[in-house]
Amino acid sequence: MTQLSRFLYGGDYNPDQWPEETWSKDIHVFKKADINSATINIFSWALLEPREGKYNFSKLDKVVQQLSDANFDIVMGTATAAMPAWMFKKYPDIARVDYQDRRHVFGQRHNFCPNSSNYQRLAGELEKQLVERYKDNKHIVFWHINNEYGGNCYCENCQNAFKKWLKNKYKTVEGLNKAWNMNVWSHTIYDWDEIVVPNELGDVWGIKGSETIVAGLSIDYLRFQSESMQNLFKMEKKIIKKFDPETPVTTNFHGLPNKMVDYQKWAKGQDIISYDSYPTYDAPAYKAAFLYDLMRSLKHQPFMLMESAPSQVNWQPYSPLKRPGQMEATEFQAVAHGADTVQFFRLKQAVGGSEKFHSAVIAHSQRTVTRVFKELADLGKKLKNAGPTILGSKTKARFAIVFDWSNFWSYEYVDGITQDLNYVDSILDYYRQFYERNIPTDIIGVDDDFSNYDLVVAPVLYMVKHGLDKKINDYVENGGNFVTTYMSGMVNSSDNVYLGGYPGPLKEVTGIWVEESDAVVPGQKIKVLMNGKDYDTGLICNLIHPNDAKILATYASEFYAGTPAVTENQYGKGRAWYIGTRLEHQGLTQLFNHIIFETGVESLVCDSHKLEITKRVTEDGKELYFVLNMSNEERTLPSKFTGYEDILTGEKAHKDMKGWDVQVLRN
């Protein structure tokens, strides 16, 4: 990671929406909360370039000067995420076309075509002006390119670029026809010009484009769109580095996670990962923790929490206030899992337009006596005290869960068996097992090095690309422990089924083959017998034939009662477990008691008392334990931490932890 000089505490600031005479007062209020940074210029293109080639930086100059004079660290946006009206009028091809074949008009945001040469040219020209102007300002500590990339395009620009992309990948139409199995429904093509991008009028349907005739086409198009947006990022980054090679560059990732953009491929081009976090009020705490661990694992370094909400979120269906203490707990949860900044959207609440009811440091009341502001100021004080100690510390994990965007896409395109396949939910079933045991866990991709881990869990590894099976076999043969599940090893990278029984190329390492897969309909429960107890299961039940594997659990109902549901296979020096059904939480917990015991890895704390406990290690080897009560109920601090120091307060650790309480402890 690019080393920060201090722990950034701040967020998005939009002074261009306010009279100039209010800016100095805003900065004074921010300082009262120990805020030391501001993210600016994210959506200012219309102000900076009111007409093509006519630039006006006068207002931004003043904003930068005032923040610099106040010794704020500045995260400088490139303003390319929302386009001015004149651009739509003069260059209609810049507007993206949705999968229903409708071209967007001026309005909203995230509505540019990534393959529009006009958008690329105009964004590059603005970028050059911006970077040349501010490259020598030492208060600018990060360049923030665009904003929350997303929104696929299906226009003629993209269609032409997609054909070139396919030619480069498949070389011949014969190769493409074979990869996509285009003999189905007479889809065979004989010329590259016959390719049509997937859309509702062609091979995709459903409200969200969730159904597809040719999955290979749709998956390749998602890969292509992710690369197209990534190329825009690379273009802007190249311009920045030409004039300012030292200041690090990022763009903010978002979502649960964002399905449209393959962040694992993008991560290589980021100087630092940044993430926008907005958990819903009813989301379990482990879901946010998973996303933070994913962001940390993208570069195996601390990341930036680029956006979060002080209290209410504007766009969710229901946005209750964050309860007293909850804001601090949720922000420290990000820090506990690897964040080296705490930043909000936004610093000052807007009076109009979209997101005007989204919470902020300066609320509509414009008072500093409010509950939220007092909590923000208290958080600022704690970060000021503890930030230097936390900054740059890392998480060391011996367990890993595999998350892969090609599997994300292909798994949810499955046509048949059941409509209830949800990739993220399936991954979370397994992440929760480690979260509740306070076992540090990395979220890795299929290209990461498995040998760094004692246990690798790859749930619903539906798509196994060429070479991945050998990588898994080698890992287990050399002593690794591997877990996979139903809906794994079924197709290749073009979504064509492996023959010979599921899990295809994973049959050898798992020591089993699957004959059929039964769909469990809503409201139906299938029983699984494990260690003399019955457990409920659902979604899918694989009918398993063990070859070399031993049986750990069997079905206890339906016509396949008595057949294997869970198996364990010794393979070389290691072991592979196959879980042929979606065990409910109690049953999965019982199974993972066995699996984790076999690995020899222990929890950070055995008597966690329903507290979330994570650990970061400083460069000089000091261990920092983050103890979070992610509920409104009182909990008890584990006895292990008796006598430890809470670096947030400088006092000894306290035993009774009220709702949403946080301690960061060192011995």
UniProtKB/Swiss-Prot annotation:
The active site is at E148 (proton donor), E307 (nucleophile). The keyword Metal-binding applies. GO terms for molecular function: beta-galactosidase activity; metal ion binding. It catalyses: Hydrolysis of terminal non-reducing beta-D-galactose residues in beta-D-galactosides. Coiled coil: none annotated. Substrate binds at R109, N147, W315, E355, K356, F357, H358. Hydrolyzes lactose between 30-45 degrees Celsius. Keywords: Glycosidase, Hydrolase, Metal-binding, Zinc. One of its GO terms (biological process) is galactose metabolic process. Hydrolyzes lactose, oNP-galactoside (oNPG), pNP-galactosidase (pNPG), pNP-mannoside, pNP-glucoside, pNP-fucoside, pNP-N-acetylglucosamide, but not pNP-arabinoside or 4-methylumbelliferyl-beta-galactopyranoside (MUG). Transgalactosylates lactose at 10 g/L, but not at 270 g/L. This is Beta-galactosidase LacA. The gene is lacA.
